[in-house]
Swiss-Prot record:
NCBIfam families: PRK05408.1. One of its GO terms (molecular function) is iron ion binding. The lineage of its organism: Bacteria, Pseudomonadati, Pseudomonadota, Gammaproteobacteria, Lysobacterales. It comes from Xylella fastidiosa (strain 9a5c). Belongs to the Fe(2+)-trafficking protein family. This is Probable Fe(2+)-trafficking protein.
Amino acid sequence: MQRIIFCEYEQRDTEGLDFVPYPGELGQKIFACIGKVGWAAWLVHQTMLINENRLSPRNPSHRAFLEEELNKFLFERRVAKPEGYIEPDA
């Protein structure tokens, strides 16, 4: 059964996630307030951040940086691109 939520990222009613995608309170907030399209957009952005900044998800300071960027991206609509980043051709 599909769950419809108001997505804070897309600013419209959309299909909600099927599962809590992140641990803790933040994961519950994402589950309640972010749709599938918004979460997919974050995963693409997160991959770019990891690759361009050479981050390791095993490093606690890198994880903290990614969590901060996740909050900015999904809930504050602020997107930071690494210095010198060039968008790939579509």
